[in-house]
Amino acid sequence: MRKFTLLMLLLIVISMSGIAGAAEVKNLNTSKTFTKIQEAIDDPSTTDGNIIIVGPGNYTENILVNKSLTLKSNGSAIINAVSSEKSTITIKANNVWIEGFIIIGGKNGIYMENVTGCTITNNTIQNAFVSGWEYYGGNGICLVNSTNNTITNNIIRNNTWNGINVCESKGNIIKNNTIMYSGGIGIYVWGFNKFEGNNIIENNRIINATYGGIYLFRPSNNKICRNYIANVSSGGGGMSGAICIDVSDYNIVKDNIGVNCDGGLFTDGMIGNEITNNIFKNCKVAVSESTYGPASRNNKIYGNYFINYETAISDPKGELVDNIWNTTEGGNYWSNYTGNNTGDGTGNIPYYYDNKPLVVDLAIEDIAAKPSGIEVRVKNLGKADIKKIDPLTKLKIKISCDNDVYETFIDPLSAGESQIVRWDKIVPEGNHTIKAEIPYSAEGYLIGTNIRDADISNNVFSKMVQGFVQNKTFTITLTNLGKSTITIKYYISIYTNPVNGTKVSYRELTITLKPNETKTIELGKYPFKYAVSGTMIVKNPSRYRIPLNLRIKYEIEGLNPQMREISKYMAPRGEFRYIARYTGKEEGYADVW
């Protein structure tokens, strides 16, 4: 009986554990619960506008959303496709909201066709798979003929083809997504014919794609802004780049960064695009034009930074000539450009099609000696922004004065930006030559960088400066070493010169010192070459002879103090008069008894 009871208790515990761990799907509007997401969607009482909350757990199913619903999870609901022939989630209704899921496998992670107003946010979508090429397969998210949808803050990775595939879809917002390890393209916007896209693609991070970071094929009027793209290979096809614009017109491509890609900017038959303020770094080919399609023309391509490339422009047919590569203010920055500054911050000779390449021109503008030290003003006279070229670089500055040398580093400067370099060396009185320089190599590269200075003639600057008088604190310290209280009358003057200088200060003091008492007289701050003159009178009011034991210390800040000790007897009703002049040097100390 005891064994039977224990067995029953064990079965109850196991049963309760299973109930507690079971996945739960709840319609907040009807309060009904389900074990499958599709059951909750298909329930007759589930209608447009309902909110379905999906609890933590594994859901093995392919889901069809054919109602305007909100499906939400807290990030712990995992949807595994049961069939690889279908997308894990297929959306066939407008105004659907999908949030907080881990979506694995399927023909696509999420497939949307002929829908509008849907939001896909804060999901992880991975491992969509097809065995060969398909127009609408192997994508993390696939939009077909869909408008005004928002795809944001998703992690999309390890998909056979594209991270996000957008086919003949308009007015969509794709932003703040992280897309990694795409077998095809990170974000692919395309159509079978030219179409008005008006999609916004911004602030996405695309890492490791095979055929392109962001690829536009035939859509027009899209905005591609502030995306970061890294590690895009050519997939063996040769037509690839961080950003690819292929028979796609009137797009704005601005403020994007592409690094470590086979190609930076890939173009083919594009018209009227504005491609400005982008950075392409460590790409094998900075700009390449396809040899297959029509020529690209009337595009604005300026204000971009092409850094550390092997080939600047690949254009075998010369089809990129009919584009606007610069304004009157400047063109693009090319790291391999070797021309010099013309005085306006741009190069003196064209670089391929760019007639006004942006250059770096660091210059020492001025040197000043101040009471606090030496100041050197450094300015970037070029129109290239060093912060964009290498935001982590340090620029070496060297300053020398007399026999002292000071070396330091400054942060990169934007175009036209100045910075003050301060050296806390106090320049003494008199004339001194100060030299400041921005070191560079024989080829004109700034030391410690891969940045060429387009005008080294202004990298060195010397200036004769007048030093400053250094004010120091003057003090007199008196100590009564005797056993009697004494009263001292002190007349103190400050002179500009120890011998015959002008008097600049005068004080009369009466000081009483008890036995073993010390008092300090603060005289103020004066140039260290000034002198202190003091006349001290000590009177003996007694009718008896008394001993006088007194220590006097004259001190100028930073110089050796001078001390005198007086030990003598004072006559009855007599006085002792002591006169001294102090300059801070032993030979300048004179006393009279």
Swiss-Prot record:
One cellular component (GO) term of this entry: S-layer
Which residues get glycosylated? 29, 58, 66, 74, 114, 122, 145, 148, 158, 176, 208, 231, 326, 336, 340, 431, 471, 500, 516
Top-level division of the source organism's lineage: Archaea
| Modification comment | Glycosylated.
Keywords attached to this Swiss-Prot or TrEMBL record, sorted alphabetically, are: Cell wall, Cell wall biogenesis/degradation, Glycoprotein, S-layer, Secreted, Signal
The answer on whether this UniProt entry bears the keyword Transport reads no
Q: Name where it's found.
A: Secreted, Cell wall, S-layer
Signal sequence extent? 1-22
Among the GO biological process terms of this entry, one is: cell wall organization
* Primary localisation category: secreted
Q: Any idea what this protein is called?
A: Cell surface glycoprotein
Its ancestry begins with: Archaea, Methanobacteriati, Methanobacteriota, Methanomada group, Methanobacteria
